[in-house]
Every structure is written in C-alpha cells, then in structure tokens.
Amino acid sequence: MHAWPASEVPALPGKGRDLRIHDTATGGRITLDPGPVARIYVCGITPYDATHMGHAATYNAFDLVQRVWLDTKRQVHYVQNVTDVDDPLLERAVRDGQDWTELAERETALFREDMTALRMLPPRHYIGAVEAIPGIVPLVERLRDAGAAYDLDGDIYFSVDTDPHFGEVSGLDAEAMRLLSAERGGDPERPGKKNPLDPMLWMAARPGEPSWDGASLGEGRPGWHIECVAIALDHLGMGFDIQGGGSDLAFPHHEMGASHAQALTGEHPFAKAYVHAGMVGLDGEKMSKSRGNLVFVSTLRREGVDPAALRLALLSRHYRSDWEWTDQVLAEAVERLARWRAAVSRPDGPSAEALVEEVREALADDLDSPAALAAVDRWAALQSAEGGTDEGAPGVVSRTVDALLGVAL
C-alpha cells in the first residue's frame, strides 16, 4: 500500500531542540534522544468513512513530532497502518450493500487526499492489515506454542497474565479495564476465557465474512492488536521511540499490543513513549463514526475552506487536550491565516531570529502548538503596528511556519 506525496520541509538555520513529550505509561514528560534515526508508529484509520477533524487532530500531533525531529537533523522512520479489515468496516459494507474491499479502498484514497491537502508528512511505510496477514500468522503460532495463547472454540486468545508488565501502559485497574474492553471491541463476558481481559489474536472464519489461510491456526482473520504489533516489529523492531494514537487507544489497543510484543520477544518496553492525542468533540460528545457527529475534512475542503486554516484550527489546541469543534474555532483560524499572510507579504519586517527559537522551544516542550502560534502572532502584530527593516525576516517567518507547523503562507 502506498502513502501520499510529501511536501517539502524547508531547512532552518541552526538546530532544533530535543523533544520532551508526555508519556502515558509514566504519567509525566520524558526527553527522547532517538539517535540519528527516530522511530515512530502511529495507528491508522479503519477506512469505512471519511476523515473527520478528530482524525486530523491526531495525525497533526504526530506530524509535529516528525517536524521537531527533522529540525534536529535526524531522519524519521515513521510507520502507519490501515485497519482494512475489521468488524465496523464489514458492518458498514453490509449496511450500504457495498463490497468491503471497494469501501476500504475508496475511503483510504480519500484519507490520502485529505492528508495531502493538510500537508501531513507521509509515513515511510503505510501498511494495510490485510497485506500484513502472512507475517501475523507465525506470530500467533509462536505465542500459542509458548503458552501465551490458547484456543477457545477455534478462536485464539492471548493470555494477558503471561506478561508481567500488563497494565503499565494505561495504568488502569482491572475493573476500569473490563469496562473499557466491553466498550472498545473486547468480549470480557465470553465464557471460557482464562481472563476476561484476554484479547483475540485470531478469529476463526465466520460465515459470510472474509477469511485467510492461517496455517495451523485454521481459516480466519487476525485480531486488531496483533496487526499493529506485527507491522511495528517488522519495520521498527522493539524499543522504538513513540507509539502514538488517540487517547481512546491507550486501552485496550496499546496496552494489548505492548503485551503481545513483550511476550513474543521477551524484551521490554515495546515503545519508549506512549503518546496520545485528545478527543475532538461536537455538540458535547466525542466526534466518532459510530455516533455520526462528524465534521469531515473533505466536506470542509469542498466548501472552500483553505486547508491551511484547518491546520491552524488544529494547532490552536494543545494536542493532549479534549476540545470542541465549533464554527468559532474555524473562524479564528481563517482570520489568523489572513493576518499571517499579510504580515509575510511585505518586503521587510522586524527581525525573526527570536521567533524561530520561540517556536522551536514551544514545540519541543510537549508539542505546545498554542504557544508556537502565539509567538507568530506577536511577530505579525509587530509587523502590522511598526514594520521593520530586516529584508529577510518575512521569508524566515514563512519558512519557520512551513517547516515546523506545516502551514504554507
């Protein structure tokens, strides 16, 4: 599966700061020092509907991570998956009378278009769950043969009790885990499981649903968590720098994935930092496909909204915060974009040297994009009020905003 085209990232003078990021597993900020190649895995979409602003907010956060690392002169090995076979996708296809593969391909193509328009840097590897199945089967077999997985009526489950580190990612107690498991695709009430929290690794073939050759596992399809583990281990290995996604993935998805990988390799941790973006709401509820309370990126683009304004709207909220999408949020972003473009359109202006460092410092401090925007606002206000004589300043500001915030002025 191919990703989307990359926009050019301008080189800035000097060197960026090392990233200090909030780690869900420890509950505090840690400073990451990835070495010459930073490694990041971000969980991708389940392609049964268009990209909404909640999706965009998540991918914006991890785009900032890439840009901070690139500014430190590192290479970035970024991997993202597509969950192109899953119950919600199959259910939507049946509801709408569509072929599930055509639905997945169409929505994945639209996602690529949205990411291109928003100038999100693409992953080096963009991998669908279906194409990963040949690598998933032997991992499930290894877990079963090692006693970390068991058969239940033809389905294969992972035994969470075999991982001594289970629970470290989310920090939740057993009851909270059980409640969230039931809400987020688990089956804690299924009789016969060793632990109610045990997640499915391999689902035996069901009538009317797609299935694949699972060798000794039998015909079926993989569970959600093992898909990401297989892709991450194949392309990044253990101990990569950031496992990223929305905050609703901390449990069960990232918790279970870490346990799968740790049981497979005997190594810990799966990732050095677990980084989670907040939820975007609409009308008082989390924006989600299941609720149908969605604002689509593609719809806003068709209505003529500049993608750069959408990007600024996302950047106006800290990535870890939960926030509401409103017309006012968008209006403020449109107005900010106009101010910035007017400021950099002049032939000269106030010195921008301090601005570059302020934006760098803000983003290195747990991706504080609101502080970065405020720094650019101050320069634009000074330009509007007093102007300046530095002929290179508007260009420096434009390149800084492009390189570090992904906004083309």
Curated annotation (Swiss-Prot):
GO cellular component, one term: cytosol
Residue numbers covered by motif 'KMSKS' region: 286-290
Gene Ontology MF annotations: ATP binding; cysteine-glucosaminylinositol ligase activity; cysteine-tRNA ligase activity; zinc ion binding
Motif annotated as 'ERGGDP' region, chain positions: 183-188
Residues given in the record as Zn(2+) binding sites: C43, C228, H253
Catalytic activity: 1D-myo-inositol 2-amino-2-deoxy-alpha-D-glucopyranoside + L-cysteine + ATP = 1D-myo-inositol 2-(L-cysteinylamino)-2-deoxy-alpha-D-glucopyranoside + AMP + diphosphate + H(+)
Keyword Cell wall biogenesis/degradation appears in the UniProt entry: no
Cofactor binding notes: Binds 1 zinc ion per subunit.
Superkingdom of this protein's organism: Bacteria
Keywords noted in UniProt: ATP-binding, Ligase, Metal-binding, Nucleotide-binding, Zinc
InterPro entries per the UniProt record, alphabetical: Cys-tRNA/MSH_ligase (IPR024909), Mycothiol_ligase_MshC (IPR017812), Rossmann-like_a/b/a_fold (IPR014729), tRNA-synt_1_cat_dom (IPR032678)
Positions with a binding annotation for L-cysteinyl-5'-AMP: C43, G44, I45, T46, T58, N81, V82, T83, W224, G246, S247, D248, V280
Cofactor(s) needed: Zn(2+)
CDD domains xref list: Anticodon_Ia_Cys_like, CysRS_core
The UniProt record lists the keyword rRNA processing: no
The enzyme's E.C. designation: 6.3.1.13
Gene Ontology terms describing biological process: cysteinyl-tRNA aminoacylation; mycothiol biosynthetic process
Ranges spanned by the short sequence motif 'HIGH' region, renumbered to the chain: 45-55
Oligomer and partners: Monomer.
Family that this chain belongs to: Belongs to the class-I aminoacyl-tRNA synthetase family. MshC subfamily.
Role noted for this protein: Catalyzes the ATP-dependent condensation of GlcN-Ins and L-cysteine to form L-Cys-GlcN-Ins.
Entry protein name: L-cysteine:1D-myo-inositol 2-amino-2-deoxy-alpha-D-glucopyranoside ligase
The species this protein was found in: Streptomyces griseus subsp. griseus (strain JCM 4626 / CBS 651.72 / NBRC 13350 / KCC S-0626 / ISP 5235)
Lineage: Bacteria, Bacillati, Actinomycetota, Actinomycetes, Kitasatosporales
